[in-house]
């Protein structure tokens, strides 16, 4: 198994519910280390740039509006198969379809307000981690 890094965002709905610590506990219980973290209130420009891959999709405006609606917690996670582990922890995009015990089943309200974002592949993980944590402020341990 390879040690990977992935990006995770705890979205405004989950931050507002005060479940950051519960989500972090799940990362750590799965063997993932938080190697960089920050709480930010994304600007519209940052959200549009980060989600630019979805620009032509009908949900783009609503996604950006949601992501700028309140603060988010952004973290880089590291561990064996970190991308797949994080995606398993998150559950299906639609919380109604997510397995019990996943972050989205437990904390998300809808497919739009779905609590968390996670990178879907090594290539996107590298781009996403670099977007929010450029330079040397990621710390392996």
From Swiss-Prot:
Gene label:
ndk
Q: Which residues bind ATP?
A: 11, 59, 87, 93, 104, 114
Any one GO CC term of the record: cytoplasm
Q: How does it assemble?
A: Homotetramer.
> What is the role of the protein in this entry?
Major role in the synthesis of nucleoside triphosphates other than ATP. The ATP gamma phosphate is transferred to the NDP beta phosphate via a ping-pong mechanism, using a phosphorylated active-site intermediate.
- InterPro entries, from UniProt? NDK-like_dom, NDK-like_dom_sf, Nucleoside_diP_kinase, Nucleoside_diP_kinase_AS
Protein name per the record: Nucleoside diphosphate kinase
Instruction: Recite the UniProt keywords alphabetically.
Output: ATP-binding, Cytoplasm, Kinase, Magnesium, Metal-binding, Nucleotide metabolism, Nucleotide-binding, Phosphoprotein, Transferase
Which Pfam families does the record cross-reference, listed alphabetically? NDK
Report the sequence similarity comment from the record: Belongs to the NDK family.
């Amino acid at each position: 198994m390879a040690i990977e890094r992935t990006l995770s965002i705890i979205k405004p709905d989950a931050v507002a519910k005060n479940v950051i610590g519960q989500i972090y506990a799940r990362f750590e219980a799965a063997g993932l280390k938080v190697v960089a973290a920050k709480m930010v209130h994304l600007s519209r420009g940052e959200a549009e740039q980060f989600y630019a891959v979805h620009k032509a999709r009908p949900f783009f405006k609503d996604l950006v509006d949601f992501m700028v609606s309140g603060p988010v917690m952004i973290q880089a996670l590291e561990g064996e198969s970190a991308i797949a582990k994080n995606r398993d922890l998150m559950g299906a995009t639609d919380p109604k379809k997510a397995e019990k015990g996943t972050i989205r089943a437990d904390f998300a309200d809808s497919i739009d307000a779905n609590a968390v974002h996670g990178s879907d592949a090594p290539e996107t993980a590298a781009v996403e981690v670099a977007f929010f944590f450029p330079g040397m402020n990621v710390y392996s341990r």
